């Protein structure tokens, strides 16, 4: 059975690593060209988009935002910044109102500097931080800039010191770090109790399936795959209308365009990728506009000659 290119939106179960999911999909679809769009910690459940075939080349062009719903437990600090780690300190937490707690959360909204957890996949001197941490090595991670587009306080249980938040953020944001840092701001401690990713890279739960769904219906596995072009709806399209243009494109040559068309159409930006398609809406690749030369220059070409 020939595998269809595109994206599977896996609703990952607890305890399964992102790499485990990729291995299972490779086996189920009998194809090697499979990759995920970003690591989801084993204890985190929810959306894990997986690219199949040529779709792996388009991962960088997907929307990068992600949305989580998480619970934070105040009063506890662990070596992993989540409840599954070793407890290293415990303190009481302030019995403050929802409004006051939301004011403290303001410090995490917008563009912020965040130090990743030491048990994380961040590279330090060519090695993953979690490997150094498991060897009890002493090291520091540098703060990184991340963007929190939305942070909503959904519930606050003063008695048990548990809050539930919804976070829409940039790739590379650690909700565990928010839990840890919120505890410090409140003159307490904090760790992540549980976390669910409800959207990633433009996909959400409505598109999602369990790996068990594929196992039950392998013959119709193609029906679960979202075409690559559908995952790129956020990118402006340019249609190659002649065979000559398509041949130019597939041989890696720039496409001459009427620059007035782009100047009149405000959806195009020379800094942003352009989705190149043919008249039948078949995806041909990704290009970038060169205003000075009135060209679309190929960046990614499918079916190159």
Curated annotation (Swiss-Prot):
Active-site positions on this chain: 41
Annotated keywords: Isomerase, tRNA processing
GO molecular function: RNA binding; tRNA pseudouridine(55) synthase activity
Group of enzyme by EC: isomerase
Listed EC numbers: 5.4.99.25
GO biological process, one term: tRNA pseudouridine synthesis
Keyword Isomerase included in the entry's annotation: yes
Pfam family, any one: TruB_N
Reaction catalysis annotation: uridine(55) in tRNA = pseudouridine(55) in tRNA
HAMAP family in the record: TruB_bact (MF_01080)
Similarity annotation: Belongs to the pseudouridine synthase TruB family. Type 1 subfamily.
Function: Responsible for synthesis of pseudouridine from uracil-55 in the psi GC loop of transfer RNAs.
The protein's name: tRNA pseudouridine synthase B
Originating organism: Prochlorococcus marinus (strain MIT 9301)
Gene: truB
């Amino acid at each position: 059975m020939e595998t269809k290119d595109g994206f599977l939106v896996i609703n990952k179960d607890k305890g399964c690593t992102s790499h485990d999911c990729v291995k299972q999909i490779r086996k189920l679809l009998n194809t090697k060209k499979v990759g995920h769009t970003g690591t989801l910690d084993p204890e985190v459940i929810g959306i894990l988009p997986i690219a199949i075939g040529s779709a792996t080349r388009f991962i960088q062009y997907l929307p990068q935002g992600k949305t989580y719903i998480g619970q934070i437990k105040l009063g506890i600090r662990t070596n992993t910044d989540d409840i599954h780690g070793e407890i290293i300190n415990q303190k009481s937490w302030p019995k403050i109102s929802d409004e006051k707690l939301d004011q403290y959360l303001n410090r995490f909204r917008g563009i912020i500097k965040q130090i990743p957890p030491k048990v994380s996949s961040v590279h330090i001197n060519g090695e993953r931080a979690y490997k150094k941490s498991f060897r009890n090595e002493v090291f520091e991670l540098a703060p990184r800039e991340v963007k929190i587009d939305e942070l909503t306080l959904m519930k606050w249980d003063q008695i048990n010191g548990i809050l539930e938040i919804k976070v829409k953020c940039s790739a590379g944001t650690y909700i565990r770090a928010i839990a840890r840092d919120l505890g410090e701001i409140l003159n307490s401690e904090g760790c992540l109790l549980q976390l669910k990713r409800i959207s990633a890279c433009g996909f959400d739960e409505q598109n999602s399936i369990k790996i068990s769904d594929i196992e039950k219906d392998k013959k119709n596995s193609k029906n679960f795959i979202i075409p690559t072009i559908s995952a790129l709806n956020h990118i402006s399209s340019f249609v190659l209308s002649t065979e000559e243009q398509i041949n130019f494109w597939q041989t890696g040559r720039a496409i001459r365009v009427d620059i007035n068309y782009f100047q009149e159409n405000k959806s195009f930006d020379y800094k942003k990728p352009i989705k190149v398609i043919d008249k039948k809406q078949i995806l041909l690749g990704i290009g970038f506009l060169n205003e000075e030369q009135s060209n679309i220059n190929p960046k990614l070409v499918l079916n190159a000659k």
